[in-house]
Regions:
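Metallo-beta-lactamase
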Residues: 38, 45, 52, 74, ...
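Active-site environment of divalent metal-dependent phosphoester hydrolases
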Residues: 36-37, 64-77, 91-96
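Short, acidic/polar N-cap/turn motifs at the starts of alpha helices
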Residues: 16-20, 72-73, 101
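Glycine-rich, charged/polar anion/phosphate-binding loops
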Residues: 15-17, 70, 88-90
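Active-site neighborhood of phospho(di)ester-bond hydrolases with catalytic His/Asp-centered motifs
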Residues: 31, 63-69, 83-87
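Conserved catalytic scaffold of divalent metal-dependent phosphoesterases
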Residues: 1-64
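Acidic, His/Gly-rich catalytic cores of divalent-metal-dependent hydrolytic chemistry
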Residues: 77-149
Length: 149
């Protein structure tokens, strides 16, 4: 991307496509989406159902899968596994002025809870900044990510 410095590009290239860790005995995987080793999305499914999620993330050794790519919130508990997509943090599309996030809590008694968070912010300032810096593909970005024509 032409707005990134060479060191930023190199940093991004070195990021893993998936991070696995354990917290209070719960196995957690964090990834952009279900991807192969070439960092390509596989089996993209918009608005996945519970059965879609079980197919998209078939590894049974994870207690919690945190993923993104699809900007629509999806929080699902199925077969003792959690699938968490908090939705888009900074690209509200048609839900103007809302940044979405989620809070995952794991208690020592093994109880897991997930809370959705919505925070209003001034998208106009972001769109104006995109124009000001002459961001590449700004028209498409504003249309698809911010609902601005």
């Amino acid at each position: 991307h032409q707005c990134l410095s060479p060191s930023s590009i190199e940093f991004l290239r070195k990021l893993p496509y998936r991070v696995d860790f354990c917290e209070l005995g719960k196995k957690i995987s964090v990834m952009h989406y279900c991807m192969n080793q070439k960092n390509q999305c596989i089996n993209y499914t918009p608005n996945p159902t519970e059965s879609n999620l079980l197919e998209l993330f078939p590894e049974r050794n994870q207690d919690i899968v945190i993923y993104g790519h699809d900007h629509t919130r999806m929080i699902c508990h199925s077969q003792n596994r959690w699938f968490i997509n908090s939705g888009s943090l900074g690209c509200p599309a048609n839900d103007k002025n809302i940044a979405r996030a989620a809070i995952l809590e794991i208690e020592e008694n093994n109880h897991i809870s997930v809370r959705s968070v919505e925070i209003k912010y001034d998208v106009t300032k972001v769109v104006e900044y995109i124009d000001w810096i002459k961001y590449p593909a700004s028209g498409e970005i504003k249309k698809f990510f911010f609902g601005v024509n």
